Structures are given as C-alpha cells and as structure tokens.
Amino acid sequence: MKETLYAHVRRGAPRRRDWRLWAAVSLVLAVTLVVLIPLLWSVHYQLRYRHFVQGLSESTLAAYRAECLIAERDGELSPVSGGCGYQIYRLAAGLTPGRWGKPPEEPAPVVLDYGDGSTLSFWEVPLRNKASATGLFLWYTDPEGKSDGFSSALLHLDGIQRLLDQDAARAAAP
C-alpha cells in the first residue's frame, strides 16, 4: 500500500451541532428585533413631527415679518395679525399628533395662507379613540409643495375659529 499524505489522518465521528448556541443566537436576535422595531418607528415618528413643526415655524416667521398671513373661511379672505398667527403656531406645535394621514376629501373650512406658498388647513374630523368624538386635522403644505398632516383630540376647529374671530374684532376696533 502506498502511503499518501492523508493516510495518517483519522476522521472521528461527525460533530453534533450544539442546539443551545442556536437557541441563544435566536433569542438574542428576537430580543433585538423586539427592541429595535418600536425604537426605529418612534424615531421616525418624532422626525416627521419635527419636520412638520420646523416648516410651520419658518412659514409663521416669514408671514409675521412680511405681515402677509391671510385666512380663508367660507370663501372669504381676511388678513390675520402676526400675533394671531403665532398663537395658532403655538397651538399646532404644542399638540401631540394623533394619527398621521391624508386630509379629508371636502374643502377645508379654514385655510391659512402664509404668503410664501405654504398653507395650513384645518378640518373637524371624527376620531377613533373614545376620549373625544371629534378632533382637529391639520394639513401643512410647505413652499416646495410637500404636505403632511395629522389629527389631534386636543384641539377643535371652534378654537381656531374663535382665535380668528377675536383677531378680526381687534383689527376692526378703533
């Protein structure tokens, strides 16, 4: 018999794979996914809201400086003071967004035009939660035409209408 390089190598029994290692790896992977998915969703949600507020802030500041904020209600246009525009901004920026989504099909009862191509529209919409039957849906369109909006149970259309009415009364007073 001719000796070869592999003549002295002896193969033992095949190794059995350790199931505990695979179980541990699977458990670590599952826990990582359970932690990461909600975390990433939360970060995305926060960044989306930050973008909304930042765009609205820039539009409010530009309209305040140029004194060009216009409200459209029931087809009528009326000027809005910078102070009222800032109050509406503070209300919108202070809201906790409920559900992000698309605006209702019907025309908005109140639309604020900031004069730079951006608008903020308001609708009273039914909500899915049981804490409040209706809430306010805000839809912001920035000067580039990008739009985003959400509903919130913390504010209603009557509150926005009241602010605009008070502002109009102040402007009309001698």
Question: Where in the sequence are the language-model features?
Answer:
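Function-determining sites in protein domains
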Residues: 2-174
